[in-house]
């Protein structure tokens, strides 16, 4: 994925996370329980487009936030 696309996707994840009432710490903790080795700092970097997001992370975020892929990728 290109940098601009990942940045936009990160913005979408941040917005969805806030709407669903999760902090970055809470989201990273739920992702860790789901098997992803991720920190709050990594979530923050994903949200601002400074870290690549992997397919398994996208899938887990989708499940935790209970959203469609369309909402993440729009």
Regions found by a protein language model. Name each.
Residues 50, 54-71:
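DNA major-groove recognition helix of helix-turn-helix/homeodomain DNA-binding modules
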């Amino acid at each position: 994925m290109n940098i601009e696309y990942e940045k936009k996707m990160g913005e979408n994840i941040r917005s969805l996370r806030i709407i669903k009432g999760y902090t970055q710490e809470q989201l990273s903790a739920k992702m860790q329980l789901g098997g992803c080795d991720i920190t709050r700092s990594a979530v923050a970097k994903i949200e601002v487009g400074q870290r690549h997001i992997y397919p398994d992370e996208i899938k887990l975020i989708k499940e935790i936030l209970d959203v469609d892929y369309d909402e993440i990728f729009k």
